[in-house]
Regions:
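Surface-exposed amphipathic alpha-helical tracts and adjacent flexible/coil segments at the periphery
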Residues: 3-353
Length: 353
């Protein structure tokens, strides 16, 4: 029906498994977009009324109030069967399909859908960057050459996870393994171990590389920041209030990875994507100067003033090429500049700019 109405791409619901997506691909000649990373809904896509009743906003209209991330008491025959350590009975783990990306692509998925509309720039940029890397790897090397680096999984966990990841319904595995019962939000990654606590002078052992500026969680209300880089396996000392429950042997999680945040800031935030273009400048005496810009098979030409004879300093091809390549902070980079120039003509620098 959607194809008959003119749809060229359909987005599958998150509860579909890969076999169902493959069957859909074989039956319909339309592009398929499927979810691969981010939050999962507890309810069926488009059929949840819990948010409307419990939060006053419709999840079916993109305004979910997140009732599945709230704590609940669970009863069986009148007896409470959960406690505060597993009170988030409706909160699924986040999905990560990176390890099974070849299966996803081979099932017929044309476009990967990544959560990001309500996420910060670090999340959106880094998750997309990592998935782009492995899509390219699969396309270049095939299934045999596809291998996910553990560091990339660690980076995804550092950015956001709700107690490890799940592949969701893609492999038809359902139940408790998909759930994050103890906590509904970012759980960080286990990074430090308390070696000793001497009246607030805490010695930590780094289980992973620690970066200056990393943020570590003590409890829901308290955290501290690393003041230096520390290699995995090394120890370091931090002075903290005695009241904090940092007993010997406790594992402390990193909630914010400063290195990842800096990478995104340096490579994505405020960076203008560059387009490589070719230019052809035609300078003929007694004719309008013209510039043609070429990009990906598209050509656009603009014309300027009439070119006149130089009285003192004629234009040179070298100088014109140099000025053409001065694109400043625009999105263009001049890869090749061709100049067709008559001898002895005058070209003001302002014309080229």
């Amino acid at each position: 029906l959607l194809k008959e109405l003119g749809a060229t791409r359909i987005v599958t619901s998150r509860e579909m498994n890969l076999q169902e997506i493959k069957q859909l691909h074989e039956r319909l000649d339309v592009e398929i977009e499927s979810f691969v990373h981010g939050a999962l809904c507890y309810c069926y896509s488009g059929q949840c009324l819990l948010s409307s009743f419990n939060g006053g906003r419709s999840g079916n209209r993109g305004r979910c109030a997140q009732p599945c991330r709230m704590p609940y008491d669970v009863y069986d025959n009148g007896e409470k069967i959960n406690n505060r350590n597993n009170s988030y009975a409706l909160s699924p783990k986040d999905m990560c399909a990176l390890q099974i990306l070849p299966d996803v692509i081979e099932s017929g998925v044309y476009s990967l859908k990544i959560e990001g509309r309500m996420k910060n720039v670090t999340y959106a940029a880094m998750v997309t960057h990592i998935y782009r890397k492995y899509v390219d790897m699969y396309l270049e090397r095939g299934r045999k050459g596809f291998k996910v680096d553990k560091q990339d999984i660690d980076d995804l966990s550092d950015i956001y996870n709700r107690g490890a990841f799940t592949t969701g319904y893609y492999d038809s595995v359902k139940g408790k393994k998909m759930m994050s019962l103890g906590r509904p939000n970012h759980m960080g990654t286990e990074c430090l171990k308390v070696v000793s606590n001497k009246a607030g002078r805490i010695t930590f052992k780094a289980l992973k590389n620690v970066n200056r500026g990393d943020v570590f969680e003590i409890d829901k209300e308290h955290s501290f920041e690393s003041g230096a880089d520390v290699a995995a396996g090394q120890t370091f000392v931090v002075n903290l209030p005695k009241k904090y429950p940092l007993y010997e042997g406790r594992i402390v999680s990193r909630m914010n990875n400063a290195k990842i945040k800096a990478y995104v800031a340096d490579n994505y935030v405020g960076i203008t994507p560059k387009l490589n273009v070719d230019m052809r400048l035609v300078v003929r005496k007694n004719e309008n100067i013209s510039l043609t810009v070429m990009y990906d098979g598209i050509e656009k030409t603009c014309t300027g003033e009439i070119v006149t004879e130089a009285q003192s300093r004629p234009a040179s091809e070298e100088e014109l090429v140099k000025n053409l390549k001065k694109t400043g902070d625009t999105c263009f980079v001049v890869e090749d500049a061709e100049v067709q120039l008559d001898d002895g003509v005058f070209v003001p620098v302002g014309w080229i700019k």
